[in-house]
Each structure stands twice: as C-alpha cells, then as structure tokens.
Swiss-Prot record:
Protein name per the record: MICOS complex subunit MIC27
Disrupted-gene phenotype: Increases frequency of mitochondrial genome loss. Partially altered shape of the mitochondrial network with condensed, fragmented mitochondria accumulating at the periphery of cells. 20-40% of mitochondria exhibit an increased inner membrane surface and stacks of lamellar cristae disconnected from the inner boundary membrane.
BP-aspect Gene Ontology terms: cristae formation; positive regulation of protein oligomerization; protein-containing complex organization
Subcellular location as annotated: Mitochondrion inner membrane
Transmembrane intervals: 101-120, 142-161
Mitochondrial intermembrane topological segments: 1-100, 162-234
Length: 234
C-alpha cells in the first residue's frame, strides 16, 4: 500500500496524521495561511482566485444597480418637484380658489364622476330584471350608449369642477393645450369647435333670434295698424 503520510512512528503518533498529505504539502494548488483568530486554513489557490473574481464582479454589479436605482429615485423626485412647481405657477395660482373652492370642488367633481359612472351602467336601469318585462326609455338609451359611457362621467366631473373653480379649470385646460398636446392637434380641434359651435350653433341661434324679433316687430306693427284703422272707423 502506498503511504501518502511518510513514515510515522505509530507508537508516538497515537493515530494522529498530518492534516495535509505529504505529497500535497508543497503543491502549488493549495496554500496555508493564518487568519486573525490564530487558526490556520487551507485553501485552493485557483478556487480562491475564482471566488474572489466572482465576488468582486457581483459586488461591482450590485454597486452599479444601487447607483442606477438611486439615480432613478433622484430623477423621479426632480420630476415630481418640477410638476409641483409647474402646477403652483401655471394652474393653482388663484389664492381665493385655492383657499375656498379647489378642494371642495375637486371632491364634488369626484362625486359627479361616480354619479356619471352609475348613470351609464345598464344594470342600474333595470336591464337585468327578469320578473317583469323591461322596456328601455329614451333617456336610458341615451345614457347607456357607447359615447355616453365614455364621455358622460368625465363631462360631469369637468363641468362640476369648472363651476366651483372656473379660473383654475381654465388654467388646467391652457396648460394641457400648451404643454401636453401637439400644437397641430390643438389647432385642429379649436377649428372644429369654432366651426361646429360658433359658426354653427351660435350663428343659427343668433339668426333664429333675429328672425323671431323681426316677426314680432312685424306682428306688433300689423296689430297697431289694425287697431288704428278700427279706431278711425269708429
């Protein structure tokens, strides 16, 4: 049998053998060093180098992740602060509304939004009642139509907030048009609104008012002439 532990006097060793076989004590693959506690440790040179390299790479990667995360948090805080400063300067810049109407107006507008959501829900109009026949009314069809389900809650909320805080509401619209929406889109829907509302509804309303006024004037004049003729004949 091959003895890897050299010749040892078994009578003196009491069964104890060296920790490292003799053939490996001078190997370049292993190293022995003393740690601060005074204990000696045996380590593989190549394994230690690989673990140290892997540990350094992992620490470097974690450090990059930490720096990236801190950078993202800092950028997010800057963006939030920018939004706050912008809102104070361009939207919530009316002290009287900020003190008295913005908060209650916002809460009531939120309630209006929920009310609109309830109004456009088909089940709230009795559509799921199976005991009695259900016949949809015109108002129900109008409220539960697809455009109403999309727009009605938002329209009610916007109208309510505009009633309570008109200047802040207008500032919000201006900020959205100037800084969020594309200029071409804003110009396009302004032209469309002008054509439909101002040149359409308002113009027809004024024309109808003028026609009614002219008709009334003619009728009054005719009635006065008839009355004058009757008085002359009398």
């Amino acid at each position: 049998m091959v003895n890897f532990y050299d010749d040892v006097d078994e009578s003196k060793s009491h069964g104890e053998f060296p920790l490292i076989p003799v053939v490996l004590q001078n190997s370049s693959e292993l190293s022995v060093r003393t740690i601060p506690t005074g204990n000696e440790i045996i380590e593989s040179v190549h394994l230690t180098k690989w673990l140290r390299k892997y540990r350094n790479a992992l620490a470097s990667q974690l450090d990059r992740y930490e720096k990236g995360w801190q950078s993202k948090i800092a950028n997010f805080r800057l963006q939030v602060q920018h939004v706050i400063n912008y809102s104070r300067k361009n939207i919530f810049n009316v002290d009287s509304e900020n003190k008295h109407t913005v908060v209650p107006g916002s809460l009531i507008a939120l309630g209006a939004f929920f009310a609109g959501s309830i109004a456009v829900n088909r089940s709230n109009w009795g559509a799921k009642r199976l005991i009695f026949g259900h016949k949809s009314s015109i108002l129900e069809k109008l409220c539960t139509s697809l455009p109403s389900r999309i727009l009605l809650p938002w329209v009610l909320a916007a109208a309510t907030f505009k009633y309570w805080a008109p200047q802040t509401s207008q500032n919000l619209v201006n900020a959205t048009e100037n800084d969020l929406l594309p200029a071409d889109f804003v110009k396009s829907y302004h032209n469309t609104w002008k054509r439909i509302y101002e040149e359409g509804y308002v113009a027809k309303k004024c024309d109808l008012k003028r026609q009614i006024d002219q008709t009334l004037q003619k009728n009054i004049r005719y009635a006065r002439e008839q009355l004058y003729e009757k008085l002359e004949q009398a």
